[in-house]
Swiss-Prot record:
It is an enzyme of class 3 (hydrolase). Keywords: Cytoplasm, Endonuclease, Hydrolase, Manganese, Metal-binding, Nuclease. This is Ribonuclease HII. Residues 15-193 form the RNase H type-2 domain. SUPFAM superfamilies: Ribonuclease H-like (SSF53098). PROSITE patterns: RNASE_H_2 (PS51975). Its EC number is 3.1.26.4. Manganese or magnesium. Binds 1 divalent metal ion per monomer in the absence of substrate. May bind a second metal ion after substrate binding.
């Protein structure tokens, strides 16, 4: 049975609905990025789904379509702030800022995951990137934005292979940490670091 990715958008059809997702909670280096997207129900872009289920090429194509056709915003919380406030609080902060950065104020904010927010407009949906088109669109924007940032950082610190691992704790990345030590962009509050 195919999931109706517009279920939540239809449920709240009388409201301006934004979807939010993040990229970068688990990596050992780099920022966490959240994106907020308000889709246009009259202009549905086909092929949008959870960014993890798309090829890099397809994500890039959909990124261009989403950013050209929908209201969207991003928020970036640095590795330094993650170390200060922890990854959960950094993720929640990024989500709140992304929603606030939209040039249209959402009345309902659908967020992937099970995080709790004090703002009652925020509704957390476990597995939301597979259940809501606006969250899935946000997952694409967040993932592409973060991957591009890590590609830029990889040019400065090529030994960590961030252009391939996006800062995640792959075998090669851990070996590079052991050999070269931490870069200025590693999260020092994470176990390996």
């Amino acid at each position: 049975m195919e999931v109706d990715l517009l279920h939540f958008e239809k449920k709240y059809h009388n409201y301006i609905v934004a979807g939010i997702d993040e990229a970068g909670r688990g990596p050992l280096a780099g920022p966490v990025v959240a994106s907020a997207v308000i889709i246009d129900n009259a202009n549905i872009i086909h092929g949008i789904k959870d960014s993890k289920k798309l090829s890099k090429k397809k994500r890039a194509l959909l990124y261009e379509q989403i950013t050209s056709n929908y209201v969207w915003a991003v928020a970036i919380i640095t590795h330094t702030e993650i170390d200060k406030i922890n990854i959960l609080e950094a993720t929640k902060k990024a989500c709140s800022i992304a929603a606030a950065n939209l040039n249209v104020k959402p009345e309902i904010v659908l967020v992937d995951g099970n995080m709790q927010f004090s703002d009652e407009r925020f509704i957390s949906i476990v597995n939301g990137d597979n259940l809501s088109l606006s969250i899935a669109a946000a997952s694409i924007i967040a993932k592409v934005t973060r991957d591009r940032l890590m590609l830029e950082l990889s040019a400065k610190f090529p030994q960590y292979l961030w252009h391939k691992n996006s800062g995640y704790g792959t075998k090669e990345h851990l070996e590079a940490i052991n050999k070269y030590g931490l870069s200025p962009y590693h999260r020092k509050s994470f176990k390996c670091c």
